[in-house]
């Protein structure tokens, strides 16, 4: 068989055409949400450790959209179902925060805190219990969880003080915070300082003389406290994780942003509250029985109330921390 030679320019053009077609097909595959793969569908359900269908569908759609836009290259994405219980009793935490990595066919369900809200005594009560969240919202200083679409952003690590271990060693406590940027009703996430971090805090703070410490102030004093783990408790509106989970999640998104979808949004809450659940809307049955009717507090109505309460009940002047009694 006699082969005719093909000009080099034609070969180059054909090669580029193949690449362009391949890239276009790839982009389309991301842009159009594909069916949930069978291995992932096996994790769908309403039991502890499973992810409810509507939560997965919305989280996956958000992720694929951001990948198609070129905003996300991370192979994993996050979701949270804040209608589920955070505490199952007997020291067992509810798993309602999800880490999905489709490329490696990995699915994890872990615990996470929900926003505790506040009780402005004599004015309005939008606080939440430890187990289930009844109140949601996006108002400044409300300490409520707001559902919707988020992107993880920069990591900020800050020194909080020292604490003493069981081995009588003083350890510097530095906590890393992952800032979230939200969309729609969650668009003020940065303004509200909403993000993710370990569920740890220093309590019973005092000042100790440690002049040789790199963290000492101009008087040679450092803050000292008791390290408290509140993984089974409530947050100030952020997603809070156990220390071990926090280390893993922060390493996954540091300098490599991804998406987080938090359920429910205000439309879901309205549907449940009205008793006319729209298609795709759901609520964890155990928590719904406990809380009765959920409520969303929009910022336009709640922020003026909080501002007035602040004005009527000014915070006392900040006092310096006491000197530690123990050496």
For the regions a language model picked out, list residue spans one by one.
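A conserved hydrophobic position in a structured secondary element of the catalytic/binding core
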Residues: 241
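N-terminal secretory signal peptides that target proteins for export/translocation
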Residues: 1-7
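Bacterial N-terminal signal peptides
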Residues: 10-24
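Bacterial Sec-dependent signal peptides at the C-terminal "C-region" and cleavage site
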Residues: 21-33
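Cell wall/extracellular polymer interaction/catalysis modules
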Residues: 30-236, 244-327
């Amino acid at each position: 068989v006699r082969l005719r030679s093909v000009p080099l320019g034609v070969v180059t053009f054909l090669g580029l055409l193949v690449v362009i077609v391949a890239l276009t097909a790839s982009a389309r595959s991301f842009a159009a949400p594909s069916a949930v793969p069978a291995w992932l569908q096996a994790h769908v359900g309403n039991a502890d450790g499973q992810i409810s269908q509507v939560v997965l569908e919305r989280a996956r759609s958000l992720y694929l959209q951001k990948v198609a836009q070129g905003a996300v290259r991370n192979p994993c994405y996050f979701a949270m179902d804040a209608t589920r219980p955070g505490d199952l009793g007997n020291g067992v935490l509810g798993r309602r925060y999800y880490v999905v990595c489709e490329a490696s066919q990995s699915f994890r369900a872990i615990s996470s805190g929900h926003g505790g809200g506040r009780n402005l005594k004599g004015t309005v009560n939008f606080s939440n219990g430890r187990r289930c969240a009844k109140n949601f919202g996006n108002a400044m200083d409300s300490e409520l969880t707001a559902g919707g679409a988020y992107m993880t952003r920069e990591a900020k690590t800050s020194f909080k003080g020292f604490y003493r271990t069981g081995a009588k060693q003083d350890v510097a406590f530095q906590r890393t915070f992952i800032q979230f940027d939200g969309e729609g009703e969650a668009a003020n996430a940065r303004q509200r300082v909403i993000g993710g971090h370990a569920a740890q805090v220093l309590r019973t703070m005092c000042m100790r003389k440690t002049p040789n410490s790199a963290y000492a102030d101009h008087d040679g004093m450092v803050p000292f406290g008791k390290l408290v783990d509140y993984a089974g408790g409530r947050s100030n509106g952020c997603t809070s994780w156990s220390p071990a989970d926090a280390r893993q999640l922060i390493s996954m998104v540091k300098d490599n942003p991804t998406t987080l979808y938090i359920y429910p949004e205000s439309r879901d809450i309205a549907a449940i509250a009205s008793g006319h659940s729209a298609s795709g809307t759901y609520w964890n049955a155990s928590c719904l029985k406990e809380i009765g009717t959920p409520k969303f507090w929009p910022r336009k109505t709640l922020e003026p109330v909080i501002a007035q309460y602040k004005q009527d009940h000014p915070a006392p002047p900040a006092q310096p921390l006491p000197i530690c009694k123990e050496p």
